Amino acid sequence: MGTTARAALVLTYLAVASAASEGGFTATGQRQLRPEHFQEVGYAAPPSPPLSRSLPMDHPDSSQHGPPFEGQSQVQPPPSQEATPLQQEKLLPAQLPAEKEVGPPLPQEAVPLQKELPSLQHPNEQKEGTPAPFGDQSHPEPESWNAAQHCQQDRSQGGWGHRLDGFPPGRPSPDNLNQICLPNRQHVVYGPWNLPQSSYSHLTRQGETLNFLEIGYSRCCHCRSHTNRLECAKLVWEEAMSRFCEAEFSVKTRPHWCCTRQGEARFSCFQEEAPQPHYQLRACPSHQPDISSGLELPFPPGVPTLDNIKNICHLRRFRSVPRNLPATDPLQRELLALIQLEREFQRCCRQGNNHTCTWKAWEDTLDKYCDREYAVKTHHHLCCRHPPSPTRDECFARRAPYPNYDRDILTIDIGRVTPNLMGHLCGNQRVLTKHKHIPGLIHNMTARCCDLPFPEQACCAEEEKLTFINDLCGPRRNIWRDPALCCYLSPGDEQVNCFNINYLRNVALVSGDTENAKGQGEQGSTGGTNISSTSEPKEE
């Protein structure tokens, strides 16, 4: 019996131990087991690839498992999400009340899985998404840099150097002639507006040379014969570089090193120094917005100032807003505000460009707009959240897309006639300019060239421009004022270059309903472009 009793005691002990290992113990037993269980979160779960990566950072085996890139998360300043469950679970035994601990027992693997699954998803998403920005950033950088590397230089792009972009120019050859004569090839016209006016006279001489060269190229590219075109371009290039060296020797500074040579050696030197011998330049990013179209409203309107009051009054008849919008259109309130403001502007402009009147009209109109905004239960304009105050006015002023009221004005350069330029001139546009002789030139270009096939329009317009300049400096010399003294220069490329820089560089092109503009200008035979000689837009 004694042996049987001892055996029964051993079996009872084993049964109790087995029941305790299966979670059937008391709350006290749970408090003893939970810390050990949470200590193993991350590797005590059944083996699976995702869970094998979720080792705590401070685990002794964490450095021996998982892919090599997983280790990068350990050196990041923010604590990893994988370590967070461990820190929270270590505090649970001390922080949880007793009644929480004696609740219904949970399976031992339920809590680790719930804690681990979120921590597995986020690191994987972060680590899969992290390389993407690096991959994206590695490609756009060269493109964004190249887009502006040949564009107009200024101090914001690293200061002025010893030469302008594209100088010296490449020598014309059969390899680059087509690129030289490409209609859409862009180049910078240099002058006081984009060159330093002190201590950099060598850049001014380079800019004048490039301007002179482009004028000659424009003339040569009109030759129908490829051979004649190439010979013409070569002569223009050689003359331009010879003129440059003459200008270099006319000052007391050290001349360009190629100018110290003579004849063919000088030309070969310039050719070897050319940074872009094939003239394959990227198009420079334009800061001039295209003429807007569609139902885009210029809202909020810019605050009237002494600087934009002329545009507000003198260009008011060219500003147009869409009509007949549906009554439910969300732009209706903005459209109504613009119409009311234009009506008030008309009253103020009749008082002699009254700035105080326009500013008060602007403020009152936007206050009424905000009143209508709050009359409906929709999203209200951000600025209307402010009460009527200078803060609200400043908010609207900052968000005005066209603070100068120049949405429908595009400044064009008639110095270089291209197919794209003719596309603007032959459309339903109005040209405004200070110079009284420009309307006649634009009229001739559009009336005689817009009916031709598109590829021939630019060539025709360039010939009309040269003819018109010769006429202005010839029989009609005394009927207009020439403040730049262009007609005193030698006829040809030098004279044309002077016109391009001083008279044709900035011409305002206005888009809109020009039929309502009364008593202004004339209309060409194509019915496309209206001409107006006025001092309203700013050209300089």
Swiss-Prot record:
Please state the protein's primary subcellular location. secreted
Region Disordered, as annotated, extends over 41-85, 120-175, 515-540
Region called 2 X approximate repeats, residue ranges: 150-405
- Tell me a GO biological process for this protein: endochondral bone growth
Keywords, comma-separated and alphabetical: Angiogenesis, Biomineralization, Disease variant, Extracellular matrix, Glycoprotein, Mineral balance, Osteogenesis, Repeat, Secreted, Signal
Q: Work out whether the entry's keyword set contains Repeat.
A: yes
* Compositionally biased intervals (Polar residues): 71-85, 146-156
What is this protein's tissue specificity according to the annotation?
Answer: Expressed in breast cancer tissues. Little or no expression observed in normal breast tissues. Expressed in skin; wide expression is observed throughout the dermis with minimal expression in the epidermis.
Spell out the GO cellular component terms annotated for this protein, sorted alphabetically and separated by semicolons: collagen-containing extracellular matrix; extracellular exosome; extracellular matrix; extracellular region; extracellular space; platelet dense granule lumen
Query: From start to end residue, where is composition biased (Low complexity)?
Result: 528-540
User: GO terms for molecular function, please?
Assistant: interleukin-2 receptor binding; protease binding
Keyword Repeat on entry: yes
Instruction: Check the UniProt entry and state the signal peptide residues, or none.
Output: 1-19
Subcellular location per UniProt equals: Secreted, Extracellular space, Extracellular matrix
| UniProt cross-references to InterPro entries, sorted A to Z | ECM1, Serum_albumin-like
Q: Which SUPFAM superfamilies match?
A: Serum albumin-like
Assembly behavior: Interacts (via C-terminus) with HSPG2 (via C-terminus). Interacts with EFEMP1/FBLN3 and LAMB3. Interacts with MMP9.
Instruction: Identify the disorder associated with this protein.
Output: Lipoid proteinosis: Rare autosomal recessive disorder characterized by generalized thickening of skin, mucosae and certain viscera. Classical features include beaded eyelid papules and laryngeal infiltration leading to hoarseness. Histologically, there is widespread deposition of hyaline material and disruption/reduplication of basement membrane.
Q: What does this protein do?
A: Involved in endochondral bone formation as negative regulator of bone mineralization. Stimulates the proliferation of endothelial cells and promotes angiogenesis. Inhibits MMP9 proteolytic activity.
Query: What is the designated name of this protein?
Result: Extracellular matrix protein 1
Q: Which organism is it from?
A: Homo sapiens
